A protein has these predicted regions:
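Glycine/proline-centered hinge or cleavage motifs at structural transition points of membrane proteins
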Residues: 169-170, 183
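Membrane-water interface segments at the C-terminal ends of transmembrane alpha-helices
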Residues: 3-37, 46-156, 180, 184-200, ...
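Short, Lys/Arg-enriched, Gly/Pro-containing loop segments at transmembrane-helix junctions
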Residues: 258-268
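Short coil/turn motifs that cap or connect alpha-helices
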Residues: 83, 172-173
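Membrane-helix/interface signature in polytopic inner-membrane proteins
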Residues: 152-164, 173
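Short hydrophobic, aromatic-rich alpha-helical segments embedded in or entering the lipid bilayer
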Residues: 212-226
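Hydrophobic positions on the alpha-helical face of helix-turn-helix-like DNA-binding modules
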Residues: 165-166, 176, 180, 221
Length: 274
């Protein structure tokens, strides 16, 4: 069948291509000018390896906490008519738009040595800054909204009639959550968890304020940029980009293996013409 020229689609294609260039050109430029052997040697240095381990460890801990706490919150916001529900949803979105450095200052004011929580725990010799806990707290603040918002949208997309039918058969809310709501919403939730882990891994601003030491990989990259300039910071930047790409690839692969590829590749199966 002959395709007709559609100026609207051409215009949209040009506009979209400009955005893709802005998104992909920096990554392509990084790969084209890569010094593989030198970067590998730089990343094999003890300080770089320590920063990488800390970032992966902290972001994984943060991801587990975000999943454990964020998924139930998303379910509540999707299914329960809470008082001031719109306000709670807006508050969940807030850390996504607050500048990272401002978020770090807020965290330090609360959890720092002279903060409301930090001062209280300090009497028991419990410190929440300049350690792994401080890094995790920073990552939770900036990345947890991705899990909550994704869970909220995923649970809201589940047909409530399925839960109502299960309720008429005597299923409890707890049983309906595990047998109906969570399995159907999981593809969207998993996508949010992946994005949250990537966001936590690359968190810089709040971590810089809350836990400059021990260096996470983004903070280490900044230290190298200050001491050695752009050339010195490129290996860490490359490592972060590759980790993010690997996380996205693994997420897509798992979606395909579990039969959820349609969620991220198309709107849904198309009906065949009769």
């Amino acid at each position: 069948m002959k395709r007709h020229f559609n100026p609207t689609l051409v215009l949209f294609g040009v506009m979209g291509s400009l955005l893709l260039i802005d998104l992909l050109l920096p990554i392509a430029n990084l790969l084209l000018h890569a010094h593989w052997s030198k970067w590998a040697a730089d990343l094999a240095q003890p300080q770089a390896l320590a920063a990488l381990k800390i970032s992966i460890y902290a972001s994984t801990i943060a991801m587990c906490i975000m999943t454990l706490l964020g998924v139930p919150l998303g379910y509540l916001l999707a299914r329960v008519n809470l008082p001031a529900k719109r306000l709670w949803i807006s508050l969940v979105f807030l850390p996504m738009v607050v500048p990272d450095l401002a978020g770090g200052i807020l965290l330090l004011q609360t959890f720092g040595p002279y903060g409301m929580v930090g001062n209280t725990l300090g009497t028991a010799n419990i410190e929440l800054t300049n350690n792994l806990v401080g890094i995790v707290l920073s990552q939770l603040f900036v990345a947890s909204p991705f899990v909550v918002v994704s869970a909220l949208a995923a649970f809201a997309s589940v047909d409530t009639k399925l839960e109502q039918a299960a309720a008429t058969l005597g299923d409890s809310r707890w049983r309906m959550f595990w047998r109906i709501s969570l399995p159907l919403a999981w593809p969207g939730i998993a996508a949010g968890i992946t994005l949250a882990w990537i966001r936590a891994l690359g968190e810089f601003g709040a971590t810089l304020i809350m836990a400059y030491n021990p260096h996470s990989l983004p903070v280490y990259m900044w230290v190298k940029f200050e001491s050695d300039g752009l050339t010195g910071s490129l290996p860490a930047a490359f490592c972060l980009v590759m980790l993010a790409a690997a996380a996205v690839a693994i997420s897509m692969l798992l979606s395909r293996l579990t039969g959820y590829a349609d969620v991220v590749t198309r709107l849904g199966p198309q009906e065949k013409a009769a």
